[in-house]
Amino acid sequence: MMEKGTVYLVGAGPGDVRLITVKGKEAIQQAQVILYDRLANPKLLEFAPADCELIYCGKLPDRHTLRQEGINELLVAKAKEGKRVVRLKGGDPGVFGRGGEEAAALAEHNIPFEIVPGITSGIAASTYAGIPVTHREYGTSFAVVTAHDKSEDGKPSLKWKGLADSIDTIAFYMGVSNLPYICENLMKHGKAPDTPVILIQWGTYGRQKTVEGTLATIVEKVAAIQFSNPAITLVGEVVSVRDQISWFEKKPLFGRQILLARTSTTESKVAEQLTRLGADVIEFPKWKKTAVNIDKKIIENIHTYDSILFASPESAMDFFTILFNHGIDLRRIRADFFVHSKKSMKVLNERGLLAKWADEMGHPGSLLLVGENHHLQHKGDGEAYDIMMTGEKQIDGQFMPVFLRMLEEAHLDTLIFPSSASVKPFMEGLKACGLDAYKLIEDIKVVCMGSKTSLAAQDAGITVDYVPKERNVNSLVECLKEIGE
């Protein structure tokens, strides 16, 4: 009889990828199956193993992709197959996340499970909006309340008198459609009409939006701008603190929604830094890398080459791993090292090695080109060269529907090509997704890092709007600020 797998009910946190717990991230990294919701940031799925099965259980307003009963059945079925299963849920599984129902279903079938708490949006979204849910001067009590229950009309039956009289700060979850009902009942049961209210949409994301008012005015304000879920509604005097301590929305790239052409299997440093400055960054395409057999003759003759050219930082790192795994002493290599990029140069420098730029190669003698399958297009001056393929990198088709759902939620304003090598795979990836690349980018600004990248984009039929003065992140950020003005 097959041993049952374990199910991990993991809180993904409120949106910002960096707010997931260490234990939650570890569960994703070890998962064989992940069932994920709409409100779990899809970028968290990139921590999963390449062969992990991804199942979307997302719930859009009035449109459920997979009903709760079906989710419960899937969790049980996958665990009975002996799989390590992660149920990835926005916020905390136990705070209006139906984690209790899923745990009960697993217990009923004797499936081992663990619950991994997450930061709930009622606290995190408020904090990112500059509002602590408690404050000695404004509020010493706090409550989280569902604004939409399982009744036929969805209007929650609450102890309104207790909420109005006894709770200083109230966080209503998913309350946009029932906002008139909420405000009416709070005022009817004694809450002052001028009590501050704020709605926070997509809290902790770069696309976070807020609308402020009072119990008497907020309904009209929300209707005027067609505000929608996912949103937290925060009611209480502590909302007024926001004017003084708002911090997230002051980041230099807050509100920017950027599409970044991707060349690496991991998150790029550019994406990481832009995110830290407040932007939402979607990287595309998502790559997966598989191992390849290394040519034994090349390994045996590694000491005979005059020049070794690394096509990418990843291939440089893989090269040294390959040498170590084959028991080869680096000191046996007499070749000069050459690189195309600063990142590759850094990989070698960190190992105490010096390298030269590929443009300085001249007549390389016996040359070894080290790279992945899509890099190996070097053209020398007629000299023969050998190839060490360190891995085979392909666009990860499993992530294409994930990318399409991210696009549904986004309102992109900028596309960035970080290198000339990023242009062709990006265009081919969009085509594979069934998207018209030119239509997708017709209303957004295109930024290219360097003149060579700009020429590659133009050759692909793309209109380039900006080329930063220098090929570094600081210059890129200044360029993005200029676009936003």
What are these regions (language model features)?
Residues M1-V17, V22-I119, I123-A124, A231, ...:
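Class I S-adenosyl-L-methionine
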Residues E3-A12, Y56-P61, A143-H148, V281-K286, ...:
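Short, basic, glycine/proline-bearing loop/turn elements
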Residues P14-G15, P61, R67-L75, A79-E81, ...:
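Signature of uroporphyrinogen-III synthase
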Residues K25, E101-N110, G130-R136, K188, ...:
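A glycine- and small-aliphatic-rich helix-loop capping segment at beta-alpha/alpha-beta transitions
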Residues Q32-V33, E53, T169, S307, ...:
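Well-ordered beta-strand positions
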Residues D92-G94, G99-S166:
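Class I SAM-dependent methyltransferase SAM-binding "motif I" and its flanking Rossmann-like core
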Residues H135, H148-S151, N185-K221:
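Catalytic phosphate-donor-binding core of small-molecule kinases
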Residues E152-I198:
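Conserved anion/nucleotide-ligand pocket segment
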